[in-house]
Amino acid sequence: MTSTRGEAAGIPSVSLNDGHSIPVLGLGVGELSEAEAERSVAAALEAGYRLIDTAAVYGNEAAVGRAVNASGIPREEIYVTTKLAVADQGFGTSQDAARASLERLGLDYVDLYLIHWPAGDHGKYIDSWGGLMKAKQDGVARSIGVCNFNAEHLSNIIDLSFFTPAINQIELHPLLNQAELREVNAGYGIVTEAYGPLGVGRLLDHAAVTGVAQAHGKTPAQVLLRWSIQLGNVVIARSANPDRITSNLEVFDFELTDDEMATLNGLDEGTRFRPDPETYTGP
């Protein structure tokens, strides 16, 4: 299944296990102020992005919604993701939180609603998954999924609910390439979505990355995004800089060789720059 979303910028889409599809590259707005988020989303949509990723805990859903609604782009062409905060986990509270997110966004539905963190409480995230299933049934969210879930978290919710997430969004970059978890996701038919694809900037001057960039006449950031896309991931790239937002789109006119992919894959050392999902408990 393909989508018109992102076609203007040449962004392909991938099919989800529920029949919907999602662009393979999007803009993230984590840690951006409301003003920064509104400007960034407006710039991204103008540049051709059609996937925007926010969360309740980011505190900028309203700004994202303003930019989406002011863009003049038909709503069905924009893919909006938001996430359930740890504090709102639970069967009923997750549904209330989803509707509160819609109100802040000023939208009738979100394309994707995610549990932001498992947060260590087995019962809570399972109850929350039931709440997300109800939110999907009620039309609040077109697709539902999870973030930061490991193999055990996934099996817990799937075995108990008989319903599989569409997406698992995880920290993923060459220093943490998540090969085993990507394989688990694929086994369930779950699309892997990568956040932190630049390794919080730590990889931009790595010799292996800059060498590949020079070979293609591309920036290190473009190489890192291309690497993740070639692995089969959907990629969320955060930026408040309009020039970088545009530059990050220029990843569909070249391809990394098998040797270059192997070089970047070989950088994996299990390094996290974001919290460990097995120990993180909020917010």
Curated annotation (Swiss-Prot):
Any single Pfam family the record assigns to this protein: Aldo_ket_red
Keywords, alphabetical: NADP, Oxidoreductase
Catalytic activity, EC: 1.1.1.-
Amino-acid positions noted as binding NADPH in the UniProt annotation, renumbered to this chain: G196, L198, V200, I236, R238, S239, A240, R244, S247, N248, R274
GO molecular function: aldo-keto reductase (NADPH) activity
Active site: residue positions: Y58 (proton donor)
InterPro entries, per database record: AKR, Aldo/ket_reductase_CS, NADP_OxRdtase_dom, NADP_OxRdtase_dom_sf
Domain of life according to the entry: Bacteria
Name of the top EC class for this enzyme: oxidoreductase
PANTHER family, A to Z: 2,5-DIKETO-D-GLUCONIC ACID REDUCTASE, NADP-DEPENDENT OXIDOREDUCTASE DOMAIN-CONTAINING PROTEIN
Family: Belongs to the aldo/keto reductase family.
Protein name (Swiss-Prot/TrEMBL): Aldo-keto reductase Mkms_1984
